[in-house]
A protein has these predicted regions:
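Conserved N-terminal catalytic core of the sugar/cofactor nucleotidyltransferase
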Residues: 1-14, 18-20, 27, 31-98
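Glycine-rich, phosphate-binding/catalytic loops in enzymes
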Residues: 19-23, 113-116
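Conserved core of the sugar-phosphate nucleotidyltransferase
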Residues: 57, 104-127
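Short, well-ordered beta-to-alpha junction loops that form the rim of enzyme active sites
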Residues: 100-102
Length: 127
């Protein structure tokens, strides 16, 4: 399973430009970031979102077409607490890959018991 953690709203930098939005909903080209993220895994994909976020109809249709399951999380949880909540709520017993909602990879070779690290070219306040 691929869990995309996107249960906090984006930082002020992005809010000024795109409005109150989650990192995985940021536009990239003519798509949402989650559309690229979902293609990184052949496994089931789950996207965590704040429980006070209303997903619009267009995005719901895209998410359904991509077979992305949504899980809604309290937005005031820390990243670790949010991940733990998702693991417990989804009853995950198999492999789990975690991708942060603001992360873009054109391709990614997800291996069991591994950690991927990437250099940051530009920095901003993390969600």
């Amino acid at each position: 399973m691929l869990l995309i953690t996107s249960a906090k709203y984006s930082s002020a930098d992005f809010t000024l430009e795109f409005g109150k939005i989650m990192p995985s909903f940021l536009p990239l080209g003519n798509k949402r970031l989650y559309e690229y993220q979902a293609k990184l895994s052949k496994e089931k994909v789950v996207l965590s979102l704040p429980n006070n976020f209303k997903v619009n109809r267009c995005d719901l249709e895209k998410l359904e077409k991509l077979n992305i399951k949504l899980i809604f999380v309290e937005p005031n949880l820390s990243l670790g607490e949010s991940i733990l909540y998702c693991i417990n709520a989804l009853n995950i017993n198999g492999n789990l890959s975690i991708l942060h909602g603001d992360t873009f990879f054109s391709n990614l070779d997800l291996k069991e018991d591994s950690l991927c690290v990437s250099a940051v070219r530009e920095n901003y306040e993390w969600a």
